[in-house]
């Protein structure tokens, strides 16, 4: 019953008109009125922001803010996979040979997430990692490794919450929401960086257009908090053992080791 009521309420409020109004407000100068309250409620770390709070003219500018130079360091070990974002480590685990994985009691299909069987097949038997970005986090997304970009594509139309309630009661938000996917080949192995849109504010803006990417290089930004899913081929990585669900991660922090480089 809770799941049914939750989905009904989301469907009633999650329309194009609502999204349009919220997006327009966030991009308007009028939204600057609530910036101080927003920063206080979500406890935004103002010491790390590139500009002072009063210099942001709209909520959109605050959402997509940059950090001061030197506030994040990228792990330089050739064998390391780094966190592509500031966020909360949600979970990791194996991708079954059936091209599915389980998180928070819900089964997700890689075929659904990536849009077809061919893309999904290369990740069968591999590893997934999920990182959640709250409204307080830095919203820019960077590359977790160096390599060649093999494909960029967008799937889905609407987005549903990816917070705790959304993960429990929603309908596979990680594989059904609007999402932007970048696949990267590195030393003959593939990984997919899946950027999942948030409810109401779907926008994921791509900033990287070249065929190659360096570890830690900026690739995109969310216009609100959301989630990234990392998919790796079989025997490609070993997740850092100390990582725990609910742990805060910082951009550039080592989260896994490349097995081919050990």
From Swiss-Prot:
Disulfide bonds: none annotated. The active site is at residues 86, 142, 226. GO terms for biological process: phosphatidylethanolamine biosynthetic process. Its cofactor is pyruvate. It is an enzyme of class 4 (lyase). Binds 1 pyruvoyl group covalently per subunit. Keywords: Cell membrane, Decarboxylase, Lipid biosynthesis, Lipid metabolism, Lyase, Membrane, Phospholipid biosynthesis, Phospholipid metabolism, Pyruvate, Zymogen. Is synthesized initially as an inactive proenzyme. Formation of the active enzyme involves a self-maturation process in which the active site pyruvoyl group is generated from an internal serine residue via an autocatalytic post-translational modification. Two non-identical subunits are generated from the proenzyme in this reaction, and the pyruvate is formed at the N-terminus of the alpha chain, which is derived from the carboxyl end of the proenzyme. GO terms for cellular component: plasma membrane. It catalyses: a 1,2-diacyl-sn-glycero-3-phospho-L-serine + H(+) = a 1,2-diacyl-sn-glycero-3-phosphoethanolamine + CO2. InterPro entries: PS_Dcarbxylase, PSD-B, PSD_type1_pro. The modification Pyruvic acid (Ser) is found at residue 226. Pfam families: PS_Dcarbxylase. NCBIfam families: PRK03140.1, PS_decarb. Catalyzes the formation of phosphatidylethanolamine (PtdEtn) from phosphatidylserine (PtdSer). Heterodimer of a large membrane-associated beta subunit and a small pyruvoyl-containing alpha subunit. PANTHER family: PHOSPHATIDYLSERINE DECARBOXYLASE (PTHR10067), PHOSPHATIDYLSERINE DECARBOXYLASE PROENZYME, MITOCHONDRIAL (PTHR10067:SF6). This is Phosphatidylserine decarboxylase proenzyme. It comes from Bacillus cereus (strain G9842).
């Amino acid at each position: 019953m809770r799941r049914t009521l939750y989905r009904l309420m989301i469907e009633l409020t999650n329309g194009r008109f609502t999204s349009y109004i919220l997006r327009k407000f966030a991009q308007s100068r009028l939204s600057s009125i609530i910036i101080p309250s927003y920063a206080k409620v979500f406890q935004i770390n103002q010491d790390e922001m590139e500009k002072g709070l009063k210099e942001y003219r709209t909520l959109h500018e605050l959402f997509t803010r940059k950090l001061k130079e030197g506030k994040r360091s990228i792990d330089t070990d050739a064998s390391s996979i780094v966190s592509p974002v500031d966020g909360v480590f949600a979970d990791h685990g194996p991708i079954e040979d059936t091209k599915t994985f389980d998180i928070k009691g819900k089964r997700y299909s890689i075929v659904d997430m990536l849009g077809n069987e061919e893309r999904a097949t290369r990740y069968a038997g591999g590893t997934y990692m999920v990182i959640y970005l709250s409204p307080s986090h830095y919203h820019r997304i960077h590359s977790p490794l160096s390599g060649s970009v093999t494909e960029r594509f967008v799937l889905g139309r609407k987005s549903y919450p990816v917070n705790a309630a959304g993960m429990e009661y929603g309908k596979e938000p990680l594989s059904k929401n609007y999402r932007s996917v970048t696949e990267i080949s590195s030393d003959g192995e593939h990984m997919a960086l899946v950027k999942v849109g948030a409810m109401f504010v779907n926008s994921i803006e791509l900033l990287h257009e070249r065929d190659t990417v360096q570890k830690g290089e900026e690739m995109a930004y969310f216009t609100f908090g959301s989630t990234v899913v990392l998919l790796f081929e079989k025997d490609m990585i070993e997740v850092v053992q100390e990582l725990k669900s609910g742990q805060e991660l910082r951009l550039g922090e080592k989260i896994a080791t490349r097995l081919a480089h050990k």
